[in-house]
Amino acid sequence: MSRAAGVTLAASALVAAVLAVAAIPLDVLAHFAPVWLAAGLASVAAAAALRGAPLRRLSLACGALAIVAGGFLMAPELLRPPEPAAAPGAAGQIKLIQFNAYKRNGDVRRVADWLIAQDPDIVTLQEARHDLRDELLRRTGWSVAGAKEHVMIFSREPRLRMMRPPLRNSVLTYMNATYLGSAGPFEVVSTHFDWPTSRTFAQQHADLARVTAALPRERMIVTGDFNTTPWSDALRRTDLTLGLRRVDRALYSWPAQVGGRAWPLPVLPIDHVYVGKDWKVVSIERGPALGSDHYPVVVVLAPVWRR
């Protein structure tokens, strides 16, 4: 192996190690923990295979450090206990789809075809184009909350009400409505956060906690594109402050495409679903690529019946 190649490998491993270690105190880097972990694994594998490579020991050491740091960030999410599951035949189930449909996704009919075929009770959309809204309403009997916004909630049955909690100086983009389920009314809140580099990002997390605190939480469902990974301090704090349970666990939802071309492997779990104590999960899974840069998340919930 040439010296130049060995130096390049060592430099790549060093960069991965530095970024992985820096991600522990720097939350904006922590979101990319899977990237640092994968880079560390690749560096170690390459250095192990190329026994004569210059700076091989440095490559191995830096790669191992990136693996340890990335694993340290991701371990709490990967090792947390699974959600208590409801039986597949549990009564009163609802099916919900969470999806950032992507404002530049012109394949409206394909998205509508898939959503309608799923026969959901609730669909929460971010970056919802108005032609997609019109297509869904034309072909179904669904109702929509937030019809003029880019965050919309579609439902098989009309909503009972829409009580918007008053938020002063809020920077949160969200939609909420109340629906009637078999076990009683339930709240649905859907949101779309800015990127972690935005000045509004931290305030959006805090504002969402204010919304959930102002509404009944027992049968609440919160969904959205949070642009936040579960190995970040930002989402860990939100897990604690919402008063709900996040039912997705390392469910990778982004990217589905890059630069208009399909991307084979999602890297970051940034679409999330939270529920109140009176829901149990029947199933949760990632849907197919539909022309958006996000994959949909499909969750089936069953109510906990209280006497």
Question: What are the roles of these predicted feature ranges?
Answer:
Residues 1-7, 47-62, 227:
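N-terminal Sec-pathway targeting helices
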Residues 5-49:
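Membrane-embedded alpha-helical segments of integral membrane proteins
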Residues 21, 45-54, 159, 305:
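Structural signal for the C-terminal ends of transmembrane alpha-helices
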Residues 49, 58-113, 117, 134, ...:
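N-terminal signal-anchor transmembrane helix
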Residues 96, 102-116, 124-307:
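Soluble catalytic domains of enzymes that build or remodel membrane lipids, polysaccharides, and related
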Residues 120:
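Internal catalytic or translocation cores that form aromatic/hydrophobic pockets or channels
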